[in-house]
């Protein structure tokens, strides 16, 4: 599973990092670590429009997002 650590970055950087990782490695599963609430919704929309399922788990001030290819 590939991982993108986008903690410390504000929108739209986390989404851009996810797009770059998917373009580079086309992973079956991608874990994304973020602390920018605005990124949750934008990454969720991106996932659905690009053939990935989406799960989000909030842990304090951070989120773990999991994108899995359909």
PLM regions with names:
Residues 39-70:
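C-terminal structural segments of small proteins and small subunits
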Residues 22, 28-48:
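Amphipathic, hydrophobic secondary-structure cores in small proteins
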Residues 19, 33, 68-70:
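Low-complexity, intrinsically disordered/propeptide-like segments
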Residues 1-3, 29-31, 62-64:
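Intrinsic-disorder/low-complexity, polar/charged segments enriched in Ser/Thr/Lys/Arg/Asp/Glu/Gln
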Residues 5-7, 15-16, 37-41, 49-51:
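Short secondary-structure boundary micro-motifs
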Residues 27-28, 53:
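A general structural signal for well-ordered secondary-structure junctions
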């Amino acid at each position: 599973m590939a991982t993108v650590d986008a903690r410390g970055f504000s929108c739209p950087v986390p989404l851009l990092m996810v797009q770059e990782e998917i373009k580079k490695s086309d992973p079956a599963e991608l874990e994304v670590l973020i602390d920018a609430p605005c990124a949750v919704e934008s990454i969720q929309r991106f996932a659905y429009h690009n053939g990935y399922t989406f799960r989000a788990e909030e842990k304090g001030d951070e989120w773990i997002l999991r994108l899995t290819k359909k």
